[in-house]
Amino acid sequence: MSDDMSMGLPSSAGEHGVLRSMQEVAMSSQEASKMLRTYNIAWWGNNYYDVNELGHISVCPDPDVPEARVDLAQLVKTREAQGQRLPALFCFPQILQHRLRSINAAFKRARESYGYNGDYFLVYPIKVNQHRRVIESLIHSGEPLGLEAGSKAELMAVLAHAGMTRSVIVCNGYKDREYIRLALIGEKMGHKVYLVIEKMSEIAIVLDEAERLNVVPRLGVRARLASQGSGKWQSSGGEKSKFGLAATQVLQLVETLREAGRLDSLQLLHFHLGSQMANIRDIATGVRESARFYVELHKLGVNIQCFDVGGGLGVDYEGTRSQSDCSVNYGLNEYANNIIWAIGDACEENGLPHPTVITESGRAVTAHHTVLVSNIIGVERNEYTVPTAPVEDAPRALQSMWETWQEMHEPGTRRSLREWLHDSQMDLHDIHIGYSSGTFSLQERAWAEQLYLSMCHEVQKQLDPQNRAHRPIIDELQERMADKMYVNFSLFQSMPDAWGIDQLFPVLPLEGLDQVPERRAVLLDITCDSDGAIDHYIDGDGIATTMPMPEYDPENPPMLGFFMVGAYQEILGNMHNLFGDTEAVDVFVFPDGSVEVELSDEGDTVADMLQYVQLDPKTLLTQFRDQVKKTDLDAELQQQFLEEFEAGLYGYTYLEDENLLI
């Protein structure tokens, strides 16, 4: 369903009717620049996301058309006023198309620069995000594009869309007879379908079914390399990887095809180093090794025409431009240059033709295009007041804490900040133990905790972030003093990789970014699971365990954006606590400042989620009705309860109350 609508949303302060003096605008620009550095927006945002003069996140889906941008905070508020439920995914199909154009352009420049005569195709692996909006946005971009399938279901989706691309189809993954027949049917229909052999057991079935269908199969071979990347996804490449043939098996495959008279069917060489390759050196090493396979296969009489380097093109989630797990130390041009040069160099050295180069760059195409937006439903601040001095006969631990507090305010003291902090921590530890054994009262425990928070705040004020010796203490205190923000979303459903492999995603408020980030926060979801928390956040050039936050009204906190969740997250999300898919809207931004929004996914209802676990909503409603009727409640109240139960069954799985803040 869609609620296709056009909104003339403003893209600048002037169009909002907000008048500011030149001095105010200049000050906002300075603060915006500081926020860009704090959250590294300039790097992970990749010109798609920025901070405008109002201190709001703005989105420019096509950086080649900079006047086409939208204020995301204003867009969300407008949508809310029109009935949009949160959490919701705000998807920008124009970003998908720009990413595809950018990668294609990088390889075009590389081919021209190195005199490379072969073609290039980006083949989109739909496993990264199989949603129709993604596949069809890419197909309708006007750019050359192939599609990759890794299962029967994916192959059916690919074949159904193949008529719109007339390009390349690559078939990976485990294959049974039905999968293989589907691929061969696609070839018979006139599509260029490459069946990539990843297990020796597949080739006999391929040859058998090709004969049955009277079709010449178009085959590829996935070679298992010794080269391997590093990081969270390294196991998908290298000698121990799940897929691919070892060198001996590659030779066996060649001989099997030669004996069957089908050696000319083997036309594609495929390898995969791993997903999200952080270091360009690892990519270059792997391509050089795979180029040797290309050379050696030609020596064996195999006319390889396509060189599929697989995935690996990473994105900079951190914005640190480094080789850490969630970053990359290279850009699109360097990636394309390394691949084209390595393959071209091997061809020139051995007098071989330049093959068509294929990359399966799904993450790099899709990650940026989706933002999860949600509301904060509760804030727990570490508020404190400095307590008065303890009574004269108070236990020693209380007196010791008070003495440390007084010493912190005496001029000329020689004790270090760390020593003050450690002393107060030891005293508080003793008090907690004493409380458990009955030595300390509840009032005394509360007094000690308030004084400890006061001490932490006092130490925090005297620490210098530029002093490397202070960093461990700063991190410790930021964790201790951070606000707890309860956010209306499920980490397991919307960002499963943040939970499963500790992947970092950019998270920040959508507004208030023209202010100094004076507070720190940790974000907690609404699942009944202590793992439902985000553990790492962007903080300048590093990663922190708390999120920098500008000052905000705890009674009206800002909305939060979870960025770069367009790759894998929607597909991998699980049903923990029966929280379902969120609503999703597609946003189109035009140079005249107008915006069109289409509802692409209504989100799951409670009934939808119950049916997934074989709980029939109608049966549940009947069972609840039977219970209500057995009560001594009056008829009007019974009817009210039944209506509320039924409305809940067909309502959103997330919190919907207008007065949610707790």
Swiss-Prot record:
Q: Which PANTHER family match?
A: ARGININE DECARBOXYLASE (PTHR43295), BIOSYNTHETIC ARGININE DECARBOXYLASE (PTHR43295:SF9)
Q: Which family does it belong to?
A: Belongs to the Orn/Lys/Arg decarboxylase class-II family. SpeA subfamily.
Any one GO MF annotation of this record: metal ion binding
Spell out the SUPFAM superfamilies in the cross-references: Alanine racemase C-terminal domain-like (SSF50621), PLP-binding barrel (SSF51419)
Give the catalysed reaction(s), semicolon-separated: L-arginine + H(+) = agmatine + CO2
The primary location reported for this protein is periplasm
Q: Which residues bind substrate?
A: F307, D308, V309, G310, G311, G312, L313, G314, V315, D316, Y317
Compartment list: Periplasm
SUBUNIT field = Homotetramer.
Name of protein: Biosynthetic arginine decarboxylase
* Keyword annotations: Decarboxylase, Lyase, Magnesium, Metal-binding, Periplasm, Polyamine biosynthesis, Putrescine biosynthesis, Pyridoxal phosphate, Spermidine biosynthesis
- The EC designation for this entry is 4.1.1.19
The pathway entry for this protein reads as: Amine and polyamine biosynthesis; agmatine biosynthesis; agmatine from L-arginine: step 1/1
- Gene Ontology cellular-component annotations: periplasmic space
Where, per the database record, does this protein carry N6-(pyridoxal phosphate)lysine? K127
State the InterPro entries in the record.
Ala_racemase/Decarboxylase_C, Arg_decarb_HB, Arg_decarbox_C, Arg_decrbxlase, De-COase2_CS, De-COase2_N, De-COase2_pyr-phos_BS, Orn/DAP/Arg_de-COase
One BP annotation, GO: arginine catabolic process
User: Encoded by which gene?
Assistant: speA
